[in-house]
Amino acid sequence: MKSQSEFESEMYFIKKKIILTIAFVISLLPMLLNQYGGMKGVQEISGLINLYNPIGIISVLFFIIGVWIPFKNKKINKVFGGLGVVGIVISEIYNFFTWHIMNITGKMSIHNSIEFAFPEFYVGLVISLIMIAVYFCIDKIVKE
């Protein structure tokens, strides 16, 4: 039978995992919006392309592994989860610079990247950056 302190410690970790998972899902919600395109209503591309590329898929898997799969060394969990949240931002930035090359322009251009990104992209990017801060500060946010 577990002691009271072991039970409280276990409940703290479960609470932390649930909060991190909810925050992560919320940080992905802007990807449901149209983030890229030539003109609203004419050519719109969902932010889900950020998750459909290999970086996005691996990042989500790393986050899930880091938060929900217990390792003996807790630093491994922190590294996997951290790679997951940082990887989402990398995926967003990668798509920001490259999505229009095959579809519209045929070349990489910061000007085109800025011109063809809707405000929803920037909102999603800021929320993803906030998620990184939440992930690395969760121990200060959620007290035992």
Which residues make up each language-model segment?
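Hydrophobic alpha-helical transmembrane segments
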Residues: 53-67, 125-130
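Loop-to-transmembrane helix junctions at the membrane interface
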Residues: 66-99
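Cytosolic juxtamembrane helix and N-cap/initiation of the first transmembrane helix
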Residues: 1-33, 137-144
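Hydrophobic transmembrane helix segments
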Residues: 16-60, 95
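Alpha-helical membrane-associated segments of multi-pass integral membrane proteins
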Residues: 16-20, 107-142
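Membrane-interface helix-boundary signature
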Residues: 9-20, 48-52, 73-80, 114-124
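Juxtamembrane transmembrane-helix termini
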Residues: 33-43, 69-75, 97-104, 134-144
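Interfacial non-cytosolic loop connecting adjacent transmembrane helices
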Residues: 37-52, 93-123
